[in-house]
From Swiss-Prot:
This is Melanoma-associated antigen D4. Keywords: Tumor antigen, Ubl conjugation pathway. It comes from the Eukaryota. One of its GO terms (cellular component) is nucleus. One of its GO terms (biological process) is negative regulation of transcription by RNA polymerase II. Interacts with TRIM27. Residues 1-27, 136-206, 247-296, 323-379, 700-720 are annotated as: Disordered. Gene3D superfamilies: MAGE homology domain, winged helix WH1 motif, MAGE homology domain, winged helix WH2 motif. Residues 413-611 form the MAGE domain. Expressed only in brain and ovary among normal tissues. Isoform 1 and isoform 2 are specifically expressed in glioma cells among cancer cells. Detected in some renal cell carcinoma samples.
Amino acid sequence: MAEGSFSVQSESYSVEDMDEGSDEVGEEEMVEGNDYEEFGAFGGYGTLTSFDIHILRAFGSLGPGLRILSNEPWELENPVLAQTLVEALQLDPETLANETAARAANVARAAASNRAARAAAAAARTAFSQVVASHRVATPQVSGEDTQPTTYAAEAQGPTPEPPLASPQTSQMLVTSKMAAPEAPATSAQSQTGSPAQEAATEGPSSACAFSQAPCAREVDANRPSTAFLGQNDVFDFTQPAGVSGMAFPRPKRPAPAQEAATEGPSAASGVPQTGPGREVAATRPKTTKSGKALAKTRWVEPQNVVAAAAAKAKMATSIPEPEGAAAATAQHSAEPWARMGGKRTKKSKHLDDEYESSEEERETPAVPPTWRASQPSLTVRAQLAPRPPMAPRSQIPSRHVLCLPPRNVTLLQERANKLVKYLMIKDYKKIPIKRADMLKDVIREYDEHFPEIIERATYTLEKKFGIHLKEIDKEEHLYILVCTRDSSARLLGKTKDTPRLSLLLVILGVIFMNGNRASEAVLWEALRKMGLRPGVRHPFLGDLRKLITDDFVKQKYLEYKKIPNSNPPEYEFLWGLRARHETSKMRVLRFIAQNQNRDPREWKAHFLEAVDDAFKTMDVDMAEEHARAQMRAQMNIGDEALIGRWSWDDIQVELLTWDEDGDFGDAWARIPFAFWARYHQYILNSNRANRRATWRAGVSSGTNGGASTSVLDGPSTSSTIRTRNAARAGASFFSWIQHR
């Protein structure tokens, strides 16, 4: 389950259980209280009844198509709409089959890659064993307590002078001892120490003098940390991505002392001053045990360098002596993993493009922490005689994302876009603007780098399938709202429970517009008092008027409530909010006023010209946005594949989105349906804007051609105009106080 989600525990409830009457819910539990009274208004959701909880539990047994109801907390805000949207955006059988086949292919490809990697690891281990067997140096067995040969060498302390160059025979023995390290048994808890002669024969001729000067070598080895090589899958399974979905693979153990001695070279032990007893060495050795808290902070472990290992294998097979410095560098690069500790992790994202498989080192260079070996006194190694093996091209280096990154799949993006559509429609139910940060946190999540394409696909689905447009009303705070773009609710006729609030909001917007686009609080309340609305008296349909106007409408961005500067005592004023500017227009508010007074809108000449200019500016902005959106969709190849499903807008209306007097459900995205009045844009987009402006100006100034102008203004009789007329009938005397201008 994704981060940030939770599940509702199912208790084996089903629809049949509800039909049979098990765990019956009394009628009074469903109808009493205010659970549904404010369900479709400006926010103010009531608490869910036991019947709603019963339904949610029953949804858990209806199959995987409805499991999202218990996975996403934001969908529980409106479970009925969530269920309908799940059915609406469900993929057809053919698309589901293709998606299932694609996912099965991805799983099969990942399994094949794992098998190939393990086979390569087994072949490499077999080759290593053969090389070791062919180059093993026969060492005499020493009788006594310690009879098992070993390749351990005492660790030297202090600086070492630069020794003469080693012979090829010495380097060949170094390779042999280095290859013998992987063959050591993994079950040994402590390293066993042989005789000095035996160790000298193993390490080379230049290391014998070190053992004659190092007493208590048994204690030194006993104080060394016991190590064991990882299993077959852990060492060579480099294709497994580290740190995927918060999972970290076991960290490779510290290399054995024999491997360390081989890395330091055959001459590392010669010429070293006499070491102290083993206990003193152990006391001076830094503490290497990491606490559990530090281990828990380890985010991922860098996979071993396969290219360097292949180069080392080739050199061992051909018995080519490798310089000591190169061997040390190779061993340090391949045997010691780079562990990035915890802290502020880099951005987690899923890359859907095959061409872009960048690792996290490209975003942030990880700091290599000091290891237990680096904290010991440094040893002087001789200069490298040959350069390090060249790195292979990037395409040959396996990426950590090779298994966790599927190829770019439009179905995955569209699936997340459909989820965003449901999220937007449910969140817009309260008519509070939706933040981009909430979209990223609740829906987009790991696909944050593909946010532009996902939100564009969601916008396309909203427009083509539901007749709704996603508008970004605030470019700085990134706030989004849903507005109607066509006659998408023509069947929603008659009065609704939002009619009183719709009427009040239109009155307030009209007062602000007729008073110079701003109205002080005193002027507004004076106008409302003439209608019988007072701030201290609770209205039976509107509730607390002061809270509704100064809090609810402000949160929904219909109004702005600001303090008048340099006012003493402080006074406040109201302005149009961002949502009101996008959901309605000055021309529509002016027509609303004219209809209530049975007058022509052109009688308010100054306000009419201002409304016309505002309409043209809005049209220009819409055309520019539409052009930019068309170019973006062409680049992203967004088309009819976004309209997957069997559901149409009419199905939505018939099934759920009709609101009657009893109050069952409502229009989720047009609680106050400010569809652009009469959609006059549909009439004027087909003509030239310059000629159109001249025609409008001529009709307004001379009064001629008034019939044509009136027809353009009136437009078709849409549901938005019908709702406006119903609101006008509910308050016929709203604007009786407006003076003729």
